Amino acid sequence: MRAALAQANARRFAALGDPTRLQVFALISRAPLSVAEVAAQLPVSRPAVSQHLKVLADAGLVSLETAGTRNLYRPDTDAVASLRDFIDSLWDVGLARFKLQAEKVARERAATHRKEKR
């Protein structure tokens, strides 16, 4: 992973590390929402929601769109894809290691079974 991408993903994961911020992100992932709409669904004030959205935006996780007089927040699809690609790469490595270990155990069992038959 390139250093710049690693830094960007680290900022994104750090931004999502706050439980309230993670809830905010989950809400806007379902549908674009305004600050007031997010605040209505959480036990935090509008100014607090605004601050959480600012942190998410600074990390590149959300984008803002204007719909008439409303400002709506939504996840940035490129940023989410980058995080998913990173997690998928970890999963791929883990599966490959698991496969190697399973094959090793199968070979050892087969060898033990052959010895017992002699």
Across the structure, where does each feature detected by a protein language model lie?
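Catalytic tyrosine of NAD(P)H-dependent dehydrogenase/reductases that use a Tyr as the general acid/base
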Residues: G17, L42, Y73
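Short, Lys/Arg-rich nucleic-acid/phosphate-binding segment
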Residues: T66-L72
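C-terminal regulatory/oligomerization modules of transcriptional regulators
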Residues: M1-A8, L27-Q41, R46, V55-A59, ...
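Pre-recognition alpha-helix immediately N-terminal to the DNA-recognition helix
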Residues: L22-V24
